[in-house]
Amino acid sequence: RQVGYMTQKFSFYEDLSIEENLDFVARLYQLPDRKQVVAESIRGLGLEERRKQLAGQLSGGWKQRMALAACLIHQPKLLLLDEPTAGVDPKARRDFWEQIHGLAAKGLTFLITTHYMDEAERCDRLAYISYGNMLVDGTVAEVIAHAKLITWSVKGPRLGDLARQLRELPGVEQAVAFGGVLHVSGSNEQALENSVSAFRRDPWEWTRVSSGLEDVFIHLMQTAQDNFSR
């Protein structure tokens, strides 16, 4: 009872209401004062107006909120969340994370898997696992520092063509589009400088920037070894 687990795929009964689903979970845990516990769970996650609504009629964001209420109903000390906001809209994601931060402030510990780097940045500590191996762990600042990446941000026309050229050069470990700019990175500063110096001219504008968590994530993905290819 010390651990709660929330699956990525919604795993509750869609032909039951929110209230009925939570009551079912409370029965499984044999919780005393079941009705009061369910009412508090509904109130705590802001589900009062929808408590009679069938789970199958809920949007992705409301389903995740109901699932969180169910996972918290037995008051665990550790909650495992597997891709908790996959497939939900940006507002629902933000609201969900506000709930997470509020619960964490009360002392609840979360272990979360995510592919969203903006969500990873919300966590106190990170661990990057690839093919069953932990490549790096630490705070956001520690993970970024560990990669030792040098990153340039490039603005200008034909960035796709520029990226293809740069990827062929020594020292350029990645050239990846970020919205309307190109991030060019490498861990060997001199080799990177030698390769990109010829391109630091019109029509492109080059700016040295701090490497972000997403730059590091892409770098780690590229260097990770697929254990099925050994």
Feature roles, as predicted:
Residues 23, 27-50:
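Conserved ABC ATPase "signature" region
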